Swiss-Prot record:
Residues 20-459 are virion surface. Residues 1-19 form the signal peptide. It is a single-pass type I membrane protein. The gene is G. Residues 481-524 are intravirion. This is Glycoprotein.
Length: 524
């Protein structure tokens, strides 16, 4: 099997996604020792998973993360705010018109907002018309209200989507998260009660363009899927894999942190929240190939050491370090007992801290116990110093350390950083250059006659008016009476004199001086 296990095998028996990286391989199972001849020495092939036993290869296609994929998944959309603009005019007695503009809000609908958004992107002329205030009307001594409902569209407004559960995140959402449940969410409420966020694409899941289709070979054993060879020729096992969905696509997270759209017959458990997927950038892809070259180089060094041993017919415990298996799996362990070369079957595991190998001074933990030494020699070049310390030849590749550190530093976060805060709708009454307003039909309301005064002034004016009218009525009546008197005909002076009478001292009525005079003359 070409170039197998370079990356995955190193993690085969490691706990997934811990903070430490593997530094060594040590047998967790080691069989009885048996003497062998020098000619029976063999170098381990670190590019083969010897404990898989999967030899049947079948071509297939699968999806994996794109090389160069950036962690944040941007979803473009727009915000929609329902605004009611009201123009109120009053015309007073002398014809002076006062206009007052007021602004209120209403909750918009998704369909109306999407129609308004289409107006903007298509350049509909109604968009420009809808930006103006409603044209105010006026009537004498009346208050006229003209209202217009508008939809303010601000775009673009970019939010972030979580690749794991397809949730949307932005500072404009309450608590930073869209409250609508994905993937059926077609709008998200915002911190503004009358503003909603709507994705440009009605199906935001289609915007999750982070996958690429690759071709590889499935590795099976007796019909059981146990791994696959990827497009780069690297073998990856499904041991320790867990189920993980990315952007709604089912797949599996392997123990090395990579993701593949592959499902095992024996359904594994779902990944825990701390088991994140590693991004696949160009640096990681380059390191994977360098690791393969490093493992091949180590095998060549082992073969050179084996050639020297066979040629010189001599061996030292230091040279036995070349025969240690560098990746987890089945292999061999070698030691010297009483100057005799000994061999044992072993199953190697990866360790992440030296204290797992040397828990205490003089103790080499192998096979679940402190392994005994023979004249200060353990196995695979590990010895006991005169001071009682366990000395292990450093076999860790710097490239392997670099690769693991890179993997652990390039996980897809569960929450992504905010895109551009400047795209958030700032104030309730702010209409920027990008604003698009939906223009419904205007509504007019004409009130009754209104003098334009407050309530108490209105009644005071009515009372004064009543008193003024009453006084005017009285004055008018008096004037009319005088006028009528002046227009009556004047009586005859003679008749008037005759009608005048006086009363004498005796009490007898005397009609007038003339009659008295006439009467006196007659008597004489």
């Amino acid at each position: 099997m070409l170039l197998s296990t370079a990356i995955f095998a190193f993690f085969l028996n490691c706990a997934p996604c811990l903070a430490k990286f593997p530094i060594y391989t040590i047998p967790d199972k080691i069989g009885p020792w048996s003497p062998i001849d020098i000619n029976h020495l063999s170098c381990p092939n670190n590019l083969i998973v010897e404990d898989e036993g999967c030899t049947t290869l079948t071509p297939f296609s699968y999806m994996e993360l794109k090389v160069g994929y950036i962690t944040t998944i941007k979803i473009e959309g727009f915000t929609c705010t329902g605004v009611i603009t009201e123009a109120e005019t009053y015309t007073n007695f002398v014809g002076y018109v006062t206009t007052t503009f007021k602004r209120k809000h209403f909750r918009p609908t998704v369909s109306a907002c999407r129609d308004a958004y289409n107006w903007k992107i298509t350049g509909d002329p109604r968009y420009e018309e809808s930006l103006h205030n409603p044209y105010p009307d006026s009537h004498w001594l009346r208050t006229v209200k003209t209202t217009k409902e508008s939809l303010l569209i601000i775009s673009p407004s970019v939010v972030d989507m979580d690749a794991y559960d397809k949730n949307l995140y932005s500072k404009m959402f309450p608590n930073g998260k869209c409250l609508a449940s994905p993937p059926s969410a077609i709008c998200c409420p915002t911190n503004h009660d009358y503003t909603i966020w709507i994705p440009e694409n009605p199906k935001p899941g289609l915007s999750c363009d982070i996958f690429t289709t690759s071709k590889g070979k499935k590795a099976t054993k007796d019909g059981r899927l146990c791994g696959f060879v990827d497009e780069r020729g690297l073998y990856k096992s499904l041991k320790g894999a867990c189920k993980q969905r990315l952007c709604g696509v089912p797949g599996m997270r392997l123990m090395d942190g990579s993701w593949v759209s592959l499902q095992k017959t024996e359904a594994p458990e779902w990944c825990s929240p701390d088991q994140l997927v590693n991004v696949h950038d160009f640096h990681t892809d380059e390191i994977e190939h360098l690791v393969v070259e490093e493992l091949v180089k180590k095998r060549e060094e082992c073969l050179d050491a084996l050639e020297t041993i066979i040629t010189t017919k001599s061996i030292s415990f230091r040279r036995l370090s070349h025969f240690r298996k560098l990746v987890p799996g089945f292999g061999k362990a070698y030691t010297l007992i009483n100057k005799t070369l000994m061999e044992a079957d072993a199953h190697y595991k990866s360790v992440r801290e030296w204290k797992e190998v040397i828990p205490s001074k003089g103790c080499l933990m192998a096979g679940g116990r402190c392994h005994p030494h023979y004249s200060g020699i353990f196995f695979n070049g590990i010895i006991l110093s005169p001071g009682g310390d366990v000395l292990i030849p450093e076999m860790q590749s710097a490239l392997l350390q670099q690769h693991i550190e890179l993997l652990e530093s390039s996980m897809i976060p569960l929450r992504h950083p905010l895109a551009d805060p400047s795209t958030v709708f700032k104030r309730d009454d702010e209409a920027e250059d990008f604003v698009e307003v939906h223009l419904p039909d205007t509504q007019k309301l004409i009130s009754g006659i209104d003098l334009g005064f407050p309530e108490w002034k209105r009644y005071f004016l009515i009372g004064i008016s009543v008193l003024a009218l009453l006084a005017l009525a009285i004055i008018t009546a008096a004037c009319c009476k005088r006028f009528k008197r002046r227009r009556r005909p004047k009586p005859n002076p003679i008749e008037l004199i005759r009608k005048v009478s006086v009363t004498s001292q005796s009490g007898r009525a005397i009609p007038s001086w003339e009659s008295y005079k006439v009467g006196a003359t007659g008597e004489s």
